[in-house]
Regions:
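Phosphate-ester processing/binding pockets and catalytic centers
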Residues: 1-221
């Protein structure tokens, strides 16, 4: 709980699923999921407890990365996440990459498009009750790519009309980022493999979704 006079910070942890290969060898879809919380210690602690439980049972799956975890580990992670309904909200943005114009066929361009959409959603949906916003992205971009990404996204972030900070931090090193990983993967599976079960298993968490090319009519590849 935030005390009187304390800064109310909204934390946004973002991860992606899919790749940036815009050929027939690449994925058909790309997804980012953002986990919103003003109590990141609570959500991280829940997964930290699970991590130590797994360690005690001699498991070697101590990083929660949905594509790499066993089915049993995924089930346990999902169960823990479902219990965080009072602590987190999630917003996922997805695209059928075939509708992406050639000008978007790069990691910076694609992530910039998604980042701007995410910033607009934060401003409208959840940013008003906080004094500042901290966004934590996975470290998928290199140094120069991050500079280009920030240049593209900053105008949308300034529309928040409150202080903001953007950090790049490996998901494998942050438990809240690993929650975002699970949602991104679940949405991706529902689109790419027509497998709704992982997403259905996360029922109970407030989770909105947005198709960034919902008005698209032209397939470019």
């Amino acid at each position: 709980m935030t005390g009187v006079g304390e800064v109310r910070t909204l934390y946004v942890f973002v991860d992606e699923s899919g790749n940036f290969d815009f050929t027939n060898k690449g994925t058909d879809h790309f997804v980012i999921s953002a986990v919103f919380t003003d109590d990141p210690c609570r959500s991280a602690a829940a997964l930290q407890t699970l991590k130590y439980d797994l360690l005690a049972s001699r498991s070697d799956q101590l990083e929660f990365h949905a594509t790499e975890n066993s089915r049993g580990t995924r089930a346990r992670v999902t169960q823990v996440i479902r219990e965080l309904s009072q602590c987190i909200r999630v917003h996922s943005i997805y695209a059928d990459k075939h509708y992406a114009h050639r000008s978007l066929h790069s990691p910076v361009a694609m992530l910039s498009l998604f980042g701007k959409a995410l910033a607009r959603w934060v401003a409208v949906a959840v940013g008003g009750n906080h004094d500042q916003v901290v966004l934590v992205f996975d470290s998928v971009l290199t140094g120069k790519q991050r500079d280009a990404f920030m240049k593209a996204v900053k105008p949308a972030l300034k529309a928040l009309e409150k202080p903001f900070h953007v950090a790049f931090h490996p998901v494998k090193s942050d438990l809240n980022g690993q929650i975002a990983d699970y949602f991104a993967w679940s949405v991706f599976r529902s689109l790419e493999a027509k497998d709704p079960l992982p997403l259905e298993a996360l029922v109970g968490i407030s989770h909105s979704k947005f198709n960034i090319f919902e008005r698209g009519h032209t397939r470019y590849w």
